Design a protein with these regions (language model features):
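Anion-binding alpha/beta catalytic cores of soluble intermediary-metabolism enzymes, centered on
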Residues: 1-168
């Protein structure tokens, strides 16, 4: 299955367990995640992982980004992926920024044509002029980022709900 839609009244954790047991995970992945799609005045944004992986490590983040890129292409769009953090390109070399940086390095090595970079703050991710001026080396240069990969479940879920609330 390429997608799985559940209702408002189903406990999410039960639904995910059933989906994993019955549908399974694609052979080329070890993990799976969720992605919300928001259609805003500034365009369509794909946000992951908003519901499943509480504290993903670099390997899980890499799978989430690959899954997101594949899902975005399913909608006839091309993913320009920002791997988000409170840090920009190694300005903090510990904790959450390090795992994001490690995931980006892995993906850039394995998929040299993938439009992905990070770790970076959301204001740089969504403002191409600011990002390109401050970080001219980025693989996202000149691109409008449309896919946001958050470092953990709390920030991803809060981020998509914030965008949803601000974009009637």
């Amino acid at each position: 299955a390429d997608a799985f839609i559940t209702g408002l009244y189903t406990k999410y954790s039960n639904t995910i367990k059933v989906a994993k047991d019955i549908i399974g995970i694609r052979p080329e992945y070890k993990h799976f995640g969720t992605m919300h799609i928001l259609n805003t005045k500034k365009g369509v944004f794909y946000i992951a992982d908003t519901l499943i992986n509480r504290h993903p490590d670099a390997e899980v983040l890499a799978d989430i980004a690959k899954l997101a890129a594949n899902s975005v292409s399913f909608f006839n769009d091309k993913a320009a992926i920002a791997m988000l953090s409170y840090s920009n390109f190694g300005s903090d070399k510990e904790g959450s920024p390090l795992k994001v940086h490690t995931a980006v390095e892995k993906l850039q090595k394995e998929y040299p044509d993938m439009a992905i970079d990070g770790e970076l703050q959301v204001n740089f991710a969504l403002n191409k002029e600011l990002r390109d001026e401050k970080f001219p080396f980025t693989r996202l240069k000149g691109l409008d980022v449309n896919t946001l990969i958050f470092p953990d479940l709390s920030s991803a879920n809060s981020g998509y709900k914030l965008l949803q609330a601000l974009s009637p």
